[in-house]
Amino acid sequence: MSTPMDIKNALNRVVNQLDLTTEEMSDVMREIMTGQCTEAQIGAFLMGMRMKSETIDEIVGAVSVMRELAGKVELKTLDGVVDIVGTGGDGANIFNVSTASAFVIAAAGCTVAKHGNRAVSGKSGSADLLEAAGVYLNLTPVQVARCIDSVGIGFMFAQSHHTAMKHTAGPRRELGLRTLFNMLGPLTNPAGVRHQIVGVFNQALCRPLAEVLLRLGSKHVLVVHSQDGLDEFSLAAPTFVAELKNGEVTEYWVQPEDLGIKSQSLYGLAVESPAASLELIRDALGRRKTENGQKAAEMIVLNAGAALYAADHATSLKEGVALAHDALHTGLAREKLEELGAFTAVFKQENEA
């Protein structure tokens, strides 16, 4: 039994460009997440890791500890339960595509356990958007599970489930850089989903994160980054995909046209606030009275369709997109959004009583 790695030894390693093993990284992360390190040590470690560049082993070690310390959501089954999530940090300030897509996925009859947070770098995070839509966020894990069982979709507010993250908040904010933690959120779904779309801020992360999820037991995952820099499937450019399926990772590019959708510019899809994002999404999921609403609907269908494929609810990306198109155009997705708001309002009364 080797002695556990501590943060001082880890800093010494990292500053010399030496990698940590999965176990060593887990030791250091446990020290950080249980409040045993100073903010200076945490900041130095995150910066050193970023400059050295995190290995698959190190990310696996970090994710394992975060999953272990998370407030878990226990579901009856994880078969076909999907999450659609991005690292954020793509700098595009586009409306909340993955959150809007989640309601289309649920409308198509697939179960969604959505993990998300407030905006870090963008104008509107998934939590900000849902709050604007009247969804109550401060749920217990049991209440989230009830949402998922009854509505077919539930939202896990990252800060409620990953309370150990509070130790890193100061250093992360003060560094103002993307760090290891930007990658960890999408990999630490509190329900333990094994089907996922993960959007990343850099194409170079696609394959490594697919490999990390393979090591951690995921079944069918698409890790994506578009050529125009988005952490999701783009309407305006090809998207690079690292797909984990049947225990193997394959890489390919996909164009909107391959999936039966016409490419178009992203003009009109950027938002300045959660309220503006919500207005665009309500139009896209509703009557599509504006040109931007129609375009947003296409972008949502593209991403929701990919998630239906990752959930094995469809046998191909193209079939997933066709199913998502039908689910959006029935108006059911808009109803799901209102239904989740109404369902969580009951818990709000209970929790605040």
UniProtKB/Swiss-Prot annotation:
Pathway: Amino-acid biosynthesis; L-tryptophan biosynthesis; L-tryptophan from chorismate: step 2/5. Mg(2+) 2 binds at residues 231-232. Transmembrane segments: none annotated. Its EC number is 2.4.2.18. It catalyses: N-(5-phospho-beta-D-ribosyl)anthranilate + diphosphate = 5-phospho-alpha-D-ribose 1-diphosphate + anthranilate. Mg(2+) 1 binds at residues 98, 232. One of its GO terms (cellular component) is cytosol. It is an enzyme of class 2 (transferase). Coiled coil: none annotated. Signal peptide: none annotated. 5-phospho-alpha-D-ribose 1-diphosphate binds at residues 86, 89-90, 96-99, 114-122, 126. One of its GO terms (molecular function) is anthranilate phosphoribosyltransferase activity. Its cofactor is Mg(2+). Keywords: Amino-acid biosynthesis, Aromatic amino acid biosynthesis, Glycosyltransferase, Magnesium, Metal-binding, Transferase, Tryptophan biosynthesis. Anthranilate 2 binds at residue 172. Anthranilate 1 binds at residues 86, 117. InterPro entries: Anthranilate_Pribosyl_Tfrase, Glycosyl_Trfase_fam3, Glycosyl_Trfase_fam3_N_dom, Glycosyl_Trfase_fam3_N_dom_sf, Nuc_phospho_transferase. Binds 2 magnesium ions per monomer. GO terms for biological process: L-tryptophan biosynthetic process. Catalyzes the transfer of the phosphoribosyl group of 5-phosphorylribose-1-pyrophosphate (PRPP) to anthranilate to yield N-(5'-phosphoribosyl)-anthranilate (PRA). Belongs to the anthranilate phosphoribosyltransferase family. Homodimer. HAMAP family: TrpD. This is Anthranilate phosphoribosyltransferase.
